[in-house]
Structures are given as structure tokens and as C-alpha cells.
From Swiss-Prot:
Major localization listed first in the record, in broad terms: membrane
Cell compartments where the protein resides: Cell membrane
Record motif NPA 1, residues: 70-72
Motif (NPA 2): 191-193
NCBIfam families to which the protein is assigned, alphabetical: MIP
GO cellular component, one term: plasma membrane
Xref: Pfam families: MIP (PF00230)
Annotated organism of origin: Lactiplantibacillus plantarum (strain ATCC BAA-793 / NCIMB 8826 / WCFS1) (Lactobacillus plantarum)
Protein name: Glycerol uptake facilitator protein 3
Length: 240
């Protein structure tokens, strides 16, 4: 057992985000890649898969850390006065690292299927988000709104009276709701680690038939969630 509380928390954030990305990017891979049994299962399957992925990531890590699994959540909790500012950057680094390794394991798990899939854009979409219509300002606004809902919802849950152990399920339902209602514009990163970590994995791994990692867009799923998370926390702070 680690004696350093921060080190244990960082391990929890790393492992929880790893599980989140393994299961979340895993469902996108299953729906997208040629010859996958789940191919063409559709958007609802993806949104459900991401909701379950968040729930499992939180359950897997909450005994070690607060299970933020998301730099925008860590920032929002700090803005709300519920988390030390000094921990925001270390948490974010652990979360991004977990995202990189999660992307790596998804690549290994589906290894034969990359060669069977020729669409480079679809392959990138397994690892990273991208807009339905590329208009950076509006893509940014979409990420702000989605993450605002996420962080405000998470903070509101802290005032709710949920039975012990149910919070991860409620969080997963919130993720599903955001995905179904707000995710169609950008693929709802709502989490810089969810996008940047696997995007790095896409960039460095020898994935068959891959193309560019679209770094020109990558600032949107980083900046949008951070702004949205901070705004959600600010609104929470001014409410009684």
C-alpha cells in the first residue's frame, strides 16, 4: 500500500481513466471497425457504452481517489472549493496518462481489425473526437455546454441524498443523457483526458491505415471542457 496519499490518489485517477478509455473507446471500436461483431450498432450503443465506461471507471478508482477521471472535473471541483488547487495539474497528468494507455490497449485488443478497416477518419474517431461540422467556435461552444452540464450535475449530486454506492450509476446516467442530447455536434469529449490521451496514442502507435491525428482540432476538446467545467462550478457557487 502506498504511504503517500497523493501518490495513491494519482494511481486511482490513472487506473480509473484507463478503464474509462478502454471501455469507452472500446465500444466505439466495436461499432466502427470492419468485421467486428458489433459493427454498425449505432450511436445509442456508443452513448450507452460511454455511460457504462464512466460508471465502471468510477467504481474501479473511488476507493483510491475522488474518481474525477477528467481534468475539467478536477478544475471545476477546485473552482467550487471542494478540491486543492495544487492537485489539479498532477491529477490531470495522471488522467491523461491513463487515457494514453487505455488507447494503447484498445489498439492491442482490436489488432487484426485495423488492417481490415481502410477509413482513416473512422479510425481516428475511435481514439479522439471530431466535429460533425467543422466550425471551431461553435464546436468549442458545444464542448463548453456539455461540460457545463456535466460539472454542474456532479456538484449538484454532492448535495443529493443517494444511497451509498449509487453515485457512479447516477454519473453514468448523466453521461448517457449528455451523449444522447448534446453529443451529436462534436462527439462530446467533455473531458480533455478522454480526447488528448487516446489522440496521443493514435499519433504514436503503428496503427494500420491510420491518417493524421488532426492536431488542428485538438485544442477544442481541451479548452471547451475546461471552460465549461469552470462555468458549471461558478454557477454552483452562486446558488444557495
Amino acid at each position: 500500500m502506498m504511504k503517500d496519499p497523493l501518490a495513491l490518489q494519482l494511481l486511482g485517477e490513472f487506473l480509473g481513466t484507463f478503464i474509462l478509455i478502454l471501455l469507452g473507446d472500446g465500444v466505439v471500436a466495436g461499432v466502427t471497425l470492419n468485421k467486428s461483431k458489433a459493427q454498425n450498432a449505432g450511436w445509442v450503443a456508443i452513448t450507452l457504452g460511454w455511460g457504462f465506461a464512466v460508471t465502471m471507471g468510477v467504481y474501479a478508482s473511488s476507493f483510491m481517489s475522488p474518481a474525477h477521471l477528467n481534468p475539467a472535473v478536477s478544475l471545476g471541483m477546485a473552482v467550487a472549493g471542494k478540491f486543492p488547487w495544487a492537485y489539479v495539474i498532477p491529477y490531470s497528468a495522471a488522467q491523461i496518462a491513463g487515457g494514453v494507455i487505455g488507447g494503447l490497449v484498445v489498439w492491442l485488443h482490436y489488432y487484426p481489425h485495423w488492417q481490415a478497416t481502410k477509413d482513416a477518419g473512422a479510425i481516428l474517431g475511435i481514439f479522439a473526437t471530431g466535429p460533425g461540422i467543422r466550425r471551431y467556435f461553435w464546436n468549442f461552444i458545444s464542448e463548453v455546454i456539455g461540460t457545463f452540464v456535466l460539472v454542474f450535475g456532479l456538484l449538484a449530486f454532492t448535495k443529493g441524498q443517494f444511497t451509498a454506492g449509487l453515485n457512479p450509476i447516477v454519473v453514468g446516467i448523466l453521461i448517457i443523457a449528455i451523449g444522447l442530447s448534446l453529443g451529436g455536434t462534436t462527439g462530446y469529449a467533455i473531458n480533455p483526458a478522454r480526447d488528448l490521451g487516446p489522440r496521443i496514442a493514435h499519433a504514436v502507435l503503428p496503427i494500420a491505415n491510420k491518417g493524421t491525428s488532426d492536431w488542428a482540432y485538438s485544442w477544442v476538446p481541451i479548452a471547451g471542457p475546461l471552460v465549461g467545467g469552470a462555468l458549471g462550478a461558478l454557477l454552483f457557487n452562486v446558488l444557495p
